[in-house]
């Protein structure tokens, strides 16, 4: 089977496209014994996830780190969801990992997103990466990506999205996204006016909360920008290649 065959197979496995919960995907992940050598950064949020992942990848790569990135959805080809050392992986490289997931799942039913997420995580775990960057697909708390205990969690923004699955207001949705936070680890919130539920979750579990406008901030003019936070300041920074007024916030 090639990658297209596996993707078609994944579409037929589960009775519904979205099935919130981690029990099934966690059971298969345990059988796969997924383990990353370096730190993992997980990014959630209504908007800005993809841009944040791209800029993290660029910064870390420029600093000499070997990166792995998982984002979704893709624009044209499925393999766009996975990059290693800045390059999109070849379709053929993913096939053995789809086979691994198929063997590990046995009788466990997985959605398309759960199956494909596990396959990409399996590939990234085999690549001896310095840093792994994971983009949440939907929400955070019950997203398949959240089976990985990340070393740093980022919530870019919280707005009304996927309300049928995440809730009808920012407070409820915010708590879902804050589900990626971990005790004692950095939890970065770049929404300038985050829901109280996001802040409460960080305090509740003892995460190291970094809040825009409190723990860090930025300023810019027509030619350059600066960042400051917790006793550090970086000035004279060049604007990112990604254009838009919101990109400095990302």
Describe the function of each predicted region.
Residues 1-47, 51-66, 75-76, 92, ...:
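N-terminal leader/targeting and accessory segments in enzymes
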Residues 11, 61, 102, 199, ...:
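Class I S-adenosyl-L-methionine
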Residues 16-18, 22-37, 62-148, 164-166, ...:
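ATP-dependent carboxylate-amine ligase catalytic core
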Residues 40, 67-69, 147, 153, ...:
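Conserved beta-strand scaffold positions in the cores of enzyme catalytic domains, especially
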Residues 56, 120, 198, 202:
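Aromatic/hydrophobic pocket-lining residues that form π-stacking "cages" and hydrophobic walls in ligand
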Residues 67, 242-250:
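Short glycine/threonine-rich catalytic loop with a Thr-x-Gly-x-Asp
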Residues 105-110, 239-245:
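A short glycine/serine-rich beta->alpha loop
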Residues 128-135, 150-241:
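Acidic, Mg2+-coordinating active-site environments of NTP-dependent enzymes
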């Amino acid at each position: 089977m090639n990658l297209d065959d596996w993707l078609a197979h994944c579409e037929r496995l589960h009775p519904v496209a979205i099935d919130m919960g981690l029990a099934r995907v966690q059971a298969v992940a345990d059988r796969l014994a997924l383990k990353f050598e370096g730190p993992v950064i997980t990014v959630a949020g209504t908007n800005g996830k993809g841009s944040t992942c791209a800029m993290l990848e660029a910064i870390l790569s420029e600093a000499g780190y070997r990166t792995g990135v998982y984002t979704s959805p893709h624009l044209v080809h499925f393999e766009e969801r996975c990059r290693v050392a800045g390059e999109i992986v070849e379709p053929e490289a993913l096939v053995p990992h789809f086979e691994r997931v198929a063997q590990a799942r046995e009788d466990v039913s997985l959605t398309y997103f759960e199956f494909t997420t596990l396959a990409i995580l399996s590939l990234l775990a085999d690549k001896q990466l310095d840093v792994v960057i994971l983009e949440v697909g939907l929400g955070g708390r019950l997203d398949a990506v959240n089976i990985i205990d990340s070393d740093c969690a980022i919530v870019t923004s919280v707005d009304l999205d996927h309300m049928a699955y995440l809730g009808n207001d920012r407070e409820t949705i915010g708590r879902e996204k804050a589900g990626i936070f971990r005790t004692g680890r950095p939890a970065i919130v770049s929404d300038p006016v985050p829901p109280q539920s996001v802040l409460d979750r960080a305090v509740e579990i003892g995460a190291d909360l970094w809040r825009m406008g409190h723990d860090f901030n930025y300023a810019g003019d027509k030619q350059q920008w600066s960042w400051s936070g917790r006793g550090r300041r970086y000035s004279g920074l060049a604007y990112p290649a990604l254009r838009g007024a919101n990109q400095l916030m990302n």
